[in-house]
Amino acid sequence: MPVYRLTASSIISSFRVSGKRHLLLTGGRGTGKTTLLRALVPLLCPGAQEITTAAYPADRVEIRESVGGKIAVIGRFDPALPPGENRMRPVADGFLLLGVPALHRMAAGESEWAVLDELGYLENSCPEFRQAVEALLDAKRVLAVVRKQDTPFLNAL
């Protein structure tokens, strides 16, 4: 039996009919969340400010602000952690010095939308970052990729 994937335009149509304020994409690793987000941005919220993350396995996770291209490390690989998915230790300075101010700038910006790719378990470690995400959700419409994991922060989203 063939597997059918929804197109970006059909997802946007369903989203608009739903009356929802935010569009959160969730799923396991490698399921195409970021690919779908990249297809949705030009159709739903072109020109929106973005915060993206990039993971470098066995090394680090970086956060990047689209305006100005600033980058900070928010996670560092720790080989002492048990083998599995979550072997990065949060780096508070990355969240506090770049992530939180970037979220505040997005909330104060002119665009109706903000884009976050992706929110995961590292963010759970920084209350200030979590609060800034919540404030952004109150201030803007948000298109976001949310990692499918069981953490208090991600569950609250």
Question: Could you describe each region identified by the protein language model?
Answer:
Residues V3-R5, M88, A92-L96, L122-C126:
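A conditional alpha-helix N-cap/helix-loop micro-motif detector
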